[in-house]
Every structure is written in structure tokens, then in C-alpha cells.
Amino acid sequence: MENSRIRITQITARSVFVPYEAPLGPYIGRRRVGRGPGTLGASALIVRIDSDAGITGWGEGTGELASDVAKRLTGVDACSIESVLALMREVGVAPGPASGVEMALWDLQGKAAGLPVCRLLGGRLRERAEFTACMGIKEPSESADTARVYHERWGFTSIKTKAGEDAELDLAIAEAIVREVGDRAQLRPDANSGYDAAVTP
């Protein structure tokens, strides 16, 4: 395959901070993520991979990518993604930044092949995919208000909430959301295996 001779010439990674627009907020529990008092947002790592073919791939991850790791990947076959992942595991790159590198490599490979990445990964399964709004654990009334805004302002028809800390609170949150949005949006509580057999019916 012609693309297999494409080599990485440079990897750059930059941390960015994206402030949340209310009512968006921290997804996991009640943690506050931000810069300065009252600023809520999300940090991300934007990865750019340049190649000797003049093609650039972009990816998004989390954490930091050490400059020595980026230098070590220079010259590696950009289309041998498994080899790059193995090399990153070997030198101890955390999953967050590694995912950004992998995403950028897939983007680069798709551009080189003139194909959407979904084709490289086996083909399109469906024409449309439902996008789910996610919220952390909030008080029931706040959860209901957030669900309403997600649905009315942004058109979400699927809403995911965190759960698992307190089954009674989780039930109260679910009931409040259902009262607020009814059957206009599907509720998807996610307890992350937080319930034991005694709590789960």
C-alpha cells in the first residue's frame, strides 16, 4: 500500500482549556475543573502529526505528551498504528495522550487514502448516530432543569446521568428528570458498577 511509506516528521501537542456554557458542567460527580474561581471547563490535549507526504493528522486526548516521546516517534511509519501504540506502551505513555496520538494517526491515514476513517475501520454502520448529553450527579431539581435545557436549547433526545453513589438519590434524580422531560428524551443512568447485589433489583 502506497500509504505505508508515509513517515512521521513531527508531533506537537498542546493543552487547551474550554470553558463550559451553562448548564454544562463536570461530568463525574461534583468535581470542579477550571482555572480560577468560578470558571468551569474541560482541559484537552490537541495532537498534531505532520508527515513527509505533507499530510497532517489531528487528534484529541488528555494529559500531556512528553517532548522526548514525540521525538522518538519521528521517522516511524505513520500508517503502522499498532507499532506506534506498542512503542508508546513500551515507553510508558499514559492512555490519555496515547489516544490523541492514535486519533491523529487515523486522521492522517484516512486523508492519505482519500477515505473517511469509518471506512478504514470496517465501514459505516448507520447514517446517523444519536448524540447523548451527559451530566454529573446533581440534586434532583438541578438535574431536571439541566435535562430540560439540554432538550430545549440543544435538542438532545438522550440524556445520561452519573449514578452509583446513593441509590435513593439516583432514583429521585431519575424521577425528577422524567417529570420534566417526559418521553421527549430517553434517560440513561450510568452507575459504573456502583451498585452491589443488595441494591440492584
Label for each model-derived stretch:
Residues 44-46, 100, 130, 158:
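Broad gene-expression machinery/nucleic-acid interaction feature
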Residues 2-56, 68:
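Structured beta-strand/loop patches that form or line metal/cofactor-binding pockets in enzymes
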Residues 20, 69, 84, 116-117, ...:
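Glycine-rich, flexible loop/turn motifs
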Residues 41-42, 64, 79, 83, ...:
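Conserved active-site and cofactor/substrate-binding residues in soluble primary-metabolism enzymes
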Residues 2-10, 14, 111, 115-126:
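N-terminal amphipathic alpha-helix/helix-capping segment at the start of soluble metabolic enzymes
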